[in-house]
Amino acid sequence: MFESTLRTLIVIIFLSAVILFTSLIRNDSNIRSQADLNTPLPEFSLRTLDLEKNITNDDLKDLFVLNVWASWCITCRVEHPFLEEISKTIPIVGLNYKDEKNNATDWLNKLGDLYIFSLYDYYGELALDLGVTGAPETFLVYKGRIIAHHVGEVDQKVWSTKFLSKINKINND
């Protein structure tokens, strides 16, 4: 009897801890995302993945999406087809995050390069300045300011709820 009650209690405590941990992660992500809104894009100077150009934050003033990705990121592969679709309507700049150049280039050659260019952030310096916790993360940037941010995969639902209304508002102004 005592052993059965003890097992039940342990299971209840474990499940409660999992639920609490999950809710804290979700809340922290939402708070962090909201805090990042309307902040300037950090100052940076990075080479493009093809090493042909040096890009600074001053070069990026129009409306664009900044997508943090890596060849080792499974979720990046999942969201890639959707990003290809939206790249037909809005420019997407890639931020290749803590990746080997050859792996990243091979990944784009295999899946298709939807980016107007990819910044090569081997050490994750710009990603750190952006508050990135991992790939993928996606930012909507307008006039040098971050106006929307999402941690994780961007799909139709996320795109519609977090990004599209802001893009439409800008296009209608």
Task: Go through each PLM region and give its residues.
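Short clusters of small/polar residues that mark proteolytic maturation junctions
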Residues: 45, 58-59, 151
